[in-house]
């Protein structure tokens, strides 16, 4: 077995991971934890604690308060949206406020994802931001996905375990999935700008040493069961009701209520036939699944639809198209062309416009350049479906 690479490195402005993305993916991604000191030197983040509390009061934000009651070794989990008075009654220590999808709610937070786009965009889930007072924590736990934990203001103590035999059993008496036992192998205090990368299923425990904010860039890792359920639903829609169980070779059974081996063989053959997906169908089903997976909100079409000429005129006078933050985007090659996917829906496209949509969250005349008629038509359809929002101010 090869020796694990260094677990702690120093970052820089040019190499926030302390190495090239290629080396990180080769040596650490889904393999080993990594602490990067000063990955983003002087980082504080675009949100202050009061801003985060304000978001937690919004109905469209998924927020939680986690309060640890030391006397009874108990955890109290409260779900938002909250009222301002909820925060006024909190104790001086041992609580944490967490808000998911902050990148969808605040444009400046979405910009923090840029250094992480060496990972496919459809693998990036969200930026969760937490604020914790001294002692604030969510307990020792494991995540089922890769996560980058970027320290903002304040300091947090992180303990992790790299023991391959560490128990992953949960406490039965807690409102959170907290590990029943946790024996750390590494112990650090993270300062603002430090970042800890953890692959899936690495036990870890973070505790605020002083009032602090942590920015969690989480990846998307659908479970096989989720894929199977979604693919089964898509397959059922695709094949309709004409493909059915048949038994033209049926013989008089010895036992009339028995499900015999011949029946199971027919079912197996039927399911194999239904699940026999060619590459194009598999690509389409996965793209539909992954671009709508774990989406907390749906896009809404605009009140007023426009045509291609109106869009072209708007761009000519300086309008900007923004991708809706809730519209997850991906694209696939189809020969020399492409197919674009937004939140589970697809449109044919040129590879040229597919890459522009990939590389730019804001589209103006300078970015778009000279568009083919089909490309302008695509942008118009995406606007009318709510995936692109026009700012004509």
What are these regions (language model features)?
Residues 2-9, 31, 344-393:
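Long, charge-rich, low-complexity alpha-helical segments
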Residues 232-311:
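C-terminal amphipathic alpha-helical segment
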Residues 30-31, 94, 124-126, 335-337, ...:
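Sequence-level motif detector for i,i+2 pairs with an aromatic at +2
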Residues 2-27, 41-194, 202, 207-244, ...:
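Active-site region of the double-stranded beta-helix
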Residues 14-18, 77-80, 194-196, 310-326:
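Short, solvent-exposed secondary-structure boundary motifs
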């Amino acid at each position: 077995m090869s020796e694990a690479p260094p677990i702690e490195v120093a970052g820089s402005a040019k190499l926030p991971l302390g190495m090239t993305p290629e080396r990180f993916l080769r040596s650490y991604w889904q393999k080993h934890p990594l602490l990067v000191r000063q990955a983003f030197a002087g980082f504080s983040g675009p949100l202050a604690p009061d801003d985060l509390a304000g978001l937690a009061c919004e109905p469209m934000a998924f927020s939680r308060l986690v309060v640890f009651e030391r006397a009874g070794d108990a955890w109290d989990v409260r779900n938002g949206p909250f009222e301002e008075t909820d925060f006024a009654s909190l104790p001086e220590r041992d609580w944490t406020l967490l808000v998911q999808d902050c990148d969808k709610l605040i444009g400046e937070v979405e910009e923090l994802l840029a250094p992480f786009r060496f990972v496919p965009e459809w693998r990036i889930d969200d930026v969760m931001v937490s604020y914790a007072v001294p002692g604030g924590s969510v307990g020792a736990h494991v995540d089922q996905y890769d996560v980058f934990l970027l320290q903002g203001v304040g300091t947090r103590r992180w303990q992790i375990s790299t023991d391959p035999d560490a128990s992953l059993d949960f406490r039965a008496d807690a409102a959170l999935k907290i590990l029943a036992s946790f024996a750390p192998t590494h112990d650090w205090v993270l300062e603002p700008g430090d970042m800890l990368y953890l692959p899936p299923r690495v036990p870890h425990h973070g505790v605020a040493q002083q009032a602090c904010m942590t920015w969690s860039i989480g990846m998307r890792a659908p479970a096989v069961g989720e894929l199977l359920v979604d693919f089964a639903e898509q397959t059922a829609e695709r094949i309709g009701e004409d493909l059915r169980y048949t038994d033209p070779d049926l013989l008089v059974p010895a036992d009339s209520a028995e499900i015999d081996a011949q029946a199971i063989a027919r079912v197996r053959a039927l399911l194999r036939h239904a699940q026999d997906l060619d590459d194009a169908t598999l690509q389409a089903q996965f793209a539909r699944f992954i671009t709508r997976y774990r989406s907390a909100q749906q896009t809404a079409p605009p009140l007023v639809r426009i045509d291609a000429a109106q869009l072209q005129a708007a761009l000519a006078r300086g309008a900007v198209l923004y991708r809706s933050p809730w519209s997850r985007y991906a694209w696939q090659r189809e020969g020399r062309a492409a197919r674009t996917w937004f939140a589970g829906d697809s449109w044919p496209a040129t590879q040229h416009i597919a890459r522009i949509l990939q590389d730019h969250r804001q589209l103006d005349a300078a970015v778009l350049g000279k568009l083919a008629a089909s490309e302008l038509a695509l942008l118009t359809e995406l606007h009318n479906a709510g995936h692109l929002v026009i700012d004509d101010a």
